[in-house]
Amino acid sequence: MPTINQLVRKPRKSKVEKSKSPALNVGYNSHKKVQTNVSSPQKRGVATRVGTMTPKKPNSALRKFARVRLSNLIEVTAYIPGIGHNLQEHSVVLLRGGRVKDLPGVRYHIVRGALDTAGVTDRKQGRSKYGTKKPKA
């Protein structure tokens, strides 16, 4: 336990919270070619590679992912949620934060139904999460 005098000389430091989606906290000034500290809830990017990867143990599947070059020139791996997708190389996608627990290194999700990404077809429940329009009654 420190004395009052020790605390006066050297106060306690507050913990610095590390971001779980650091690529969303960086902007880019293309005129000056410098990165800036601009936080944003989503970012636009171009898919450079689309493929599948296998999850960690004990799960088994082929999870769809895309390697995306963001508008701030950072390249990240993002998960494509839902059943089926229309993404290919050079598709323009919208990214949000949110990791996939059983895929190491995947910290971002692609937003379905935005930009070049189509919503999930034939989806009746939880449509807003997958960019599906309301079906005609």
Curated annotation (Swiss-Prot):
It holds the Pfam family Ribosom_S12_S23. GO terms for molecular function: rRNA binding; structural constituent of ribosome; tRNA binding. Keywords: Methylation, Ribonucleoprotein, Ribosomal protein, RNA-binding, rRNA-binding, tRNA-binding. PROSITE patterns: RIBOSOMAL_S12. InterPro entries: NA-bd_OB-fold, Ribosomal_uS12, Ribosomal_uS12_bac. Residues 1-57 are annotated as: Disordered. The modification 3-methylthioaspartic acid is found at D102. CDD domains: Ribosomal_S12. GO terms for cellular component: small ribosomal subunit. One of its GO terms (biological process) is translation. HAMAP family: Ribosomal_uS12_B. Part of the 30S ribosomal subunit. Contacts proteins S8 and S17. May interact with IF1 in the 30S initiation complex. Belongs to the universal ribosomal protein uS12 family. With S4 and S5 plays an important role in translational accuracy. This is Small ribosomal subunit protein uS12. It comes from Streptococcus sanguinis (strain SK36). The lineage of its organism: Bacteria, Bacillati, Bacillota, Bacilli, Lactobacillales.
